[in-house]
């Protein structure tokens, strides 16, 4: 009986399609020449597991699963369109304006508080910004933005944590502003939404990225505001800005190229973790120090600078801030003071999850209940 079963199986194998394939045409499946054998996304995760498990300890598993999960977005209302109508429509979706909720409904500090009161400059938030998010734990999505009656898009979808560096910059009416690494344009658009920029210089080294920035501006900003006397878009080497326009700006945003941690875990295209870009990735902190130093040199004495990344790495965050401050002190005898943003963290803790142990600045860490970020930002004042 057993012999009959074996013979039957053998006959079935002989009749199977793959049994008729000539031996010379049988081969193992090979990777396409354009498909990496070890994807950049896997390299990124391997790198993060090695470094961030040490940096964040017990917090890393929670951050890790959040990074690998769907990101949460905010809707930045376009004040140049019918802003009040758009806000009402977003409220009907049960979304909330987290900026208005935090800034205008903050609780006053108790009189017997032991913490030192922050300076008025560090308290200031850039005005007129409206950004709606869904509450913690609500994973609803915003519908795609529409073209309004004025020919401009109603709102801009972005990681709501990306708005924090702009808020921290504390723009005042009539400020001259530099966005040193402006593309793809979300923060530049937010700067213009404040209505405070007497003129704005938006720069990015990549011409393809500045083209994308221009498309964002054309979709959201009226022609008269985009006038070259008010908004100037350039593709210069940001590291040389201190030589080009030193001591010029009231406010400077330095949102540097970084490992873009969340993007690197989900996208293969143009990933900084591609093997061909290994040296570029290793040199990122050097580039970041150079860009921040240039931004500080471009700032007027008494002006303010915000440095930001979308990376969790303290090598790209706190260490870069400290390195640039030392560089300016040693080479230019320029003193820079880091602003305390503890109060800022308290303002927005209902919307974002903050890492509690940054040496300088603040870091939004991804959390499944509030899956924004990562976003690091540090505010500085150029003293001399």
Curated annotation (Swiss-Prot):
Where does the chain bind S-adenosyl-L-methionine? 185-187, 204, 209, 237-238, 255
**SUPFAM superfamilies with a match to the protein in the record:** S-adenosyl-L-methionine-dependent methyltransferases
GO CC annotations, alphabetized: mitochondrial large ribosomal subunit; mitochondrial matrix
| InterPro entries noted in UniProt | MeTrfase_RsmB-F_NOP2_cat, MeTrfase_RsmB-F_NOP2_dom, RCMT, SAM-dependent_MTases_sf
Q: Tell me which domain of life the UniProt entry assigns to the organism this sequence originates from.
A: Eukaryota
Q: Where in the cell is it found?
A: Mitochondrion
Free-text function comment from the UniProt entry: Mitochondrial RNA cytosine C(5)-methyltransferase that methylates cytosine to 5-methylcytosine (m5C) in various RNAs, such as rRNAs, mRNAs and some long non-coding RNAs (lncRNAs). Involved in mitochondrial ribosome small subunit (SSU) maturation by catalyzing methylation of mitochondrial 12S rRNA; the function is independent of MTERFD2/MTERF4 and assembled mitochondrial ribosome large subunit (LSU). Targeted to LSU by MTERFD2/MTERF4 and probably is involved in a final step in ribosome biogenesis to ensure that SSU and LSU are assembled.
Similarity annotation: Belongs to the class I-like SAM-binding methyltransferase superfamily. RsmB/NOP family.
Query: Which protein are we looking at?
Result: 5-cytosine rRNA methyltransferase NSUN4
Q: From what organism does this protein derive?
A: Bos taurus
**Gene designation per UniProt:** NSUN4
